[in-house]
């Protein structure tokens, strides 16, 4: 039994002349016993679908699970902003079958999804770029802008000196290049000049200051003209009228008749009434002087409009 163990030896015919026939019969028997070969799978053409007008709240998992209901998905990419990482509102889905992709494009176009009408279109092979799905699984990292951070960082005194030295060196090279090409162009220095002492700068500013002439005013005109201009302006401004607190004259046409005293008569003599505007047309009226009595006459007084009685004056004795 130990001699029978091992790999199977090739079968040989008992009659060497019938060896060829024996091999043919053996191959036929082996062909019958073998399992039937599986049919080769047909290669399916893949189809890409463009999805637009997507809500910004949807993520990759939501869209992938929704589109997987129609068929197998080979690749998927949701476009995102490189600066913020937010969704741009469109995506690309690649199905394993082109027929499935066309069916999805027909059924999902103008479909109301999240208060928006989806734009779903089938993309032919010519329009599909080879790098369309290159960054489909890349994780988003917020950009750091290292160059901007380096430029805006706080520098010490030694670093500032090094920076000024580099700027001066670049400025010299630039001026040499312009001079070599025959370009006469002057531009300010890249490094600001160092500020001088405050006291020295103040003196220089006072020395270079142009003060107005003593004979001239602040406006540049002579002082006499300036004074006349101020007077003209003040005269043109209307002045407020002051309320006169002078007592009204004792003579009133509507009031009670005054007492005829010597002083009253002298005052009446001196009054002059003007009839016209010219001096030649003036008429002077002189009233006759009545006889003066020692006792003053008592004149009857009319009742005042307010209802108050006038005070009685005591007669002089």
From Swiss-Prot:
Region (Disordered): 203-317
Biased composition (Basic residues): 238-248, 308-317
Post-translational modification: Phosphorylated.
N-acetylalanine: modified positions: 2
RRM domain residues: 47-125
Phosphoserine, modified sites: 219, 253, 270
Protein name: MKI67 FHA domain-interacting nucleolar phosphoprotein
UniProt gene name: Nifk
């Amino acid at each position: 039994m130990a001699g029978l163990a091992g790999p199977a030896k090739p079968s040989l015919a008992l009659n060497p002349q019938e060896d060829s026939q024996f091999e043919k019969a053996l191959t036929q028997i082996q062909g019958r016993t073998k399992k039937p070969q599986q049919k080769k799978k047909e290669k399916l053409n893949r189809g890409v679908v463009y999805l637009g007008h997507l809500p910004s709240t949807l993520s990759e998992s939501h869209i992938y699970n929704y589109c997987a209901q129609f068929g197998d998905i080979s690749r998927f990419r949701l476009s995102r902003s490189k600066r913020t990482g937010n969704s741009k509102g469109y995506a690309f889905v690649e199905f394993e079958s082109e027929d499935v992709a066309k069916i999805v494009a027909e059924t999902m176009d103008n479909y109301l999804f999240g208060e928006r009408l989806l734009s779903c279109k089938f993309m032919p092979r010519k329009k599909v770029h080879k790098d369309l799905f290159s960054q489909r699984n890349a994780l988003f990292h917020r950009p750091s802008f290292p160059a901007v951070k380096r430029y805006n960082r706080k520098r010490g005194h030694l670093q500032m000196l090094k920076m000024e030295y580099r700027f001066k060196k670049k400025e010299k090279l630039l001026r040499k290049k312009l001079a070599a090409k025959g370009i006469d162009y002057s531009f300010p220095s890249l490094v600001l000049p160092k500020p001088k002492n405050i006291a020295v700068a103040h003196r220089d500013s006072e020395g270079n200051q142009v003060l107005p002439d003593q004979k001239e005013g602040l406006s540049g005109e002579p002082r006499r003209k300036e004074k006349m201009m101020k007077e003209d302006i003040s005269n043109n401004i209307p002045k407020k009228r002051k309320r006169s607190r002078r007592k009204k004259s004792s003579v009133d046409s509507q009031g009670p008749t005054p007492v005829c005293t010597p002083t009253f008569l002298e005052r009446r003599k001196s009054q002059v009434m003007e009839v016209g505007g010219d001096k030649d047309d003036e008429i002077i009226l002189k009233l006759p002087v009545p006889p003066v009595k020692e006792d003053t006459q008592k004149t009857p007084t009319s009742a005042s409009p307010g209802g108050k009685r006038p005070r009685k004056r005591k007669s002089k004795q």
